[in-house]
Amino acid sequence: MSSNECFKCGRSGHWARECPTGGGRGRGMRSRGRGGFTSDRGFQFVSSSLPDICYRCGESGHLAKDCDLQEDEACYNCGRGGHIAKDCKEPKREREQCCYNCGKPGHLARDCDHADEQKCYSCGEFGHIQKDCTKVKCYRCGETGHVAINCSKTSEVNCYRCGESGHLARECTIEATA
């Protein structure tokens, strides 16, 4: 999508807040996935650039909720077919909670005292968490040892407002129209 196209309908000539299709991503909108939204009033806004593909059967033209292959669906709560867990009439099955840090049951991550078993989301090593990682990775150049704000390698920046390179939107001299 070019910077001149509306984020809601994909057409050029107007900005999202002036979109004639109405709606928006704000309050009252539910994500449909793959670039579309459904409003509380039932209006659907779908990106025309991506077709609806059913993740259940892999065919285009419908979504999983409308798929004919739903007979294989089983409830995660009771294990029987014909419904899903949110519609299950059986009492909610208690599942043992596991810690996201160490993976052990019986406590949550915030109560974990297995600090030496904590896994860093940045480097993948155990013994520390991301905020304490010494092997930080720069998002600008991809190298380890520094973060983007301290990166010495210059990269071309583009303005989201006018599309020109060399400055950011907050530094743009062209007045925003949207």
Swiss-Prot record:
<feature type="modified residue" description="Omega-N-methylarginine; by PRMT1">
    <location>
        <position position="27"/>
    </location>
</feature>
<feature type="zinc finger region" description="CCHC-type 6">
    <location>
        <begin position="136"/>
        <end position="153"/>
    </location>
</feature>
<keyword id="KW-0862">Zinc</keyword>
<keyword id="KW-0007">Acetylation</keyword>
<dbReference type="GO" id="GO:0000122">
    <property type="term" value="P:negative regulation of transcription by RNA polymerase II"/>
</dbReference>
<keyword id="KW-0479">Metal-binding</keyword>
<dbReference type="GO" id="GO:0008284">
    <property type="term" value="P:positive regulation of cell population proliferation"/>
</dbReference>
<protein>
    <recommendedName>
        <fullName>CCHC-type zinc finger nucleic acid binding protein</fullName>
    </recommendedName>
</protein>
<keyword id="KW-0805">Transcription regulation</keyword>
<keyword id="KW-0804">Transcription</keyword>
<dbReference type="InterPro" id="IPR001878">
    <property type="entry name" value="Znf_CCHC"/>
</dbReference>
<feature type="region of interest" description="RNA-binding Arg/Gly-rich region (RGG-box)">
    <location>
        <begin position="25"/>
        <end position="38"/>
    </location>
</feature>
<dbReference type="GO" id="GO:0005829">
    <property type="term" value="C:cytosol"/>
</dbReference>
<feature type="zinc finger region" description="CCHC-type 3">
    <location>
        <begin position="72"/>
        <end position="90"/>
    </location>
</feature>
<feature type="zinc finger region" description="CCHC-type 5">
    <location>
        <begin position="118"/>
        <end position="135"/>
    </location>
</feature>
<dbReference type="GO" id="GO:0045944">
    <property type="term" value="P:positive regulation of transcription by RNA polymerase II"/>
</dbReference>
<feature type="modified residue" description="N6-acetyllysine">
    <location>
        <position position="8"/>
    </location>
</feature>
<comment type="subunit">
    <text>Associates with the 40S ribosomal subunit, the 80S ribosome and with polysomes.</text>
</comment>
<keyword id="KW-0677">Repeat</keyword>
<feature type="zinc finger region" description="CCHC-type 7">
    <location>
        <begin position="157"/>
        <end position="174"/>
    </location>
</feature>
<keyword id="KW-0963">Cytoplasm</keyword>
<dbReference type="GO" id="GO:0005783">
    <property type="term" value="C:endoplasmic reticulum"/>
</dbReference>
<dbReference type="GO" id="GO:0045893">
    <property type="term" value="P:positive regulation of DNA-templated transcription"/>
</dbReference>
<dbReference type="Pfam" id="PF00098">
    <property type="entry name" value="zf-CCHC"/>
</dbReference>
<dbReference type="GO" id="GO:0051880">
    <property type="term" value="F:G-quadruplex DNA binding"/>
</dbReference>
<feature type="zinc finger region" description="CCHC-type 1">
    <location>
        <begin position="4"/>
        <end position="21"/>
    </location>
</feature>
<feature type="modified residue" description="Omega-N-methylarginine; by PRMT1">
    <location>
        <position position="25"/>
    </location>
</feature>
<keyword id="KW-0678">Repressor</keyword>
<feature type="zinc finger region" description="CCHC-type 2">
    <location>
        <begin position="52"/>
        <end position="69"/>
    </location>
</feature>
<keyword id="KW-0597">Phosphoprotein</keyword>
<dbReference type="GO" id="GO:0008270">
    <property type="term" value="F:zinc ion binding"/>
</dbReference>
<keyword id="KW-0863">Zinc-finger</keyword>
<feature type="zinc finger region" description="CCHC-type 4">
    <location>
        <begin position="97"/>
        <end position="114"/>
    </location>
</feature>
<keyword id="KW-0488">Methylation</keyword>
<dbReference type="InterPro" id="IPR036875">
    <property type="entry name" value="Znf_CCHC_sf"/>
</dbReference>
<keyword id="KW-0238">DNA-binding</keyword>
<feature type="modified residue" description="N-acetylserine">
    <location>
        <position position="2"/>
    </location>
</feature>
<dbReference type="GO" id="GO:0005634">
    <property type="term" value="C:nucleus"/>
</dbReference>
<comment type="function">
    <text>Single-stranded DNA-binding protein that preferentially binds to the sterol regulatory element (SRE) sequence 5'-GTGCGGTG-3', and thereby mediates transcriptional repression. Has a role as transactivator of the Myc promoter. Binds single-stranded RNA in a sequence-specific manner. Binds G-rich elements in target mRNA coding sequences. Prevents G-quadruplex structure formation in vitro, suggesting a role in supporting translation by resolving stable structures on mRNAs.</text>
</comment>
<keyword id="KW-0256">Endoplasmic reticulum</keyword>
<feature type="modified residue" description="Phosphoserine">
    <location>
        <position position="49"/>
    </location>
</feature>
<dbReference type="GO" id="GO:0071919">
    <property type="term" value="P:G-quadruplex DNA formation"/>
</dbReference>
